[in-house]
Amino acid sequence: MSKSIWVAIGSVFGLLFILFGCAEVIQVGTTVGQGMGQISKEDKEKIDRLALQTEKAIRPMNEQEEYYVGRAVAATILGQYRLYRNEKLTRYLNEVGQALALSSSRPFTYGGYHFAVLDADEVNALACPGGIIFISRGMLKKAQNEEEVAAILAHEIAHVSHKDGLGAIQSARWAEVVTALGTEAARKLSGADLAKLVSLFEGSVNDVAKTLLVNGYSREQESAADLSALSYMNRIGYDPNALADYLEKLAREQRAGANKGFFGTHPGMQDRLSNAKSLIAEKKWTPAGHPERNRRFQQFFPFS
């Protein structure tokens, strides 16, 4: 095939791929090209194979991959924190959290949602990709009722639903991982190649862990998680005002000068509070009393 024809075909197929991002589109084009006698069967197979490899290399992480990255991130977190061993509290959090997850925009993940308490006085909450969520003792101690516990959990579920943790992984790094895993050669990796793949995977995990523990999410991501959390809460009868109440406590501490730890990775608490209040007012969500939830909170919550 002449160079000019290759350039022309490559340009057309490249444009189709950019517009539609689908290897099947390229395969339709090569079938037409072969039928018109413009390309040979061998050339068609080469182009189709290249398109499929390109699609795999730029595809997002699938649910199973997200699950394994999330597990590794959780292990990294547990290398820095101990779990708070209170079976009754953990079961209680999981009951509330599972109900909220079902009301979210992503009710099911590959490995499911799991909630646990970190044995730490600091205020913190960490949502790993795939649905493993940690809440510190210090964070829970500030909750005065089940509605506020639900607000904390709903916010973290929103981060999982939005896949915010995955956004921390450098795109170039993940493209290398996918390319390595997607090749026939991956089945016969040498020791050096396997070491590189492990290093790339660890780098992806470290990208997420660094965002959760050091850098934090952007203000836009935090505010978006708040707004989604309000909707999740409202859908199953929790009072969305509880999130505003909890944010008010955090904003008050931030105004008083708190700027380390959680407050260092979660700036702009006052803006988040204002955004939450605006949505609550717009939706006309009003507080609703649920005495049975207060009784349950008193029964299972050791910090009240």
Show where each model-derived region lies.
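A Zn2+-metalloprotease active-site environment signal
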Residues: 2, 22-304
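Bacterial N-terminal signal peptides that target proteins for export
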Residues: 1-10
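Bacterial N-terminal signal peptides
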Residues: 10-19
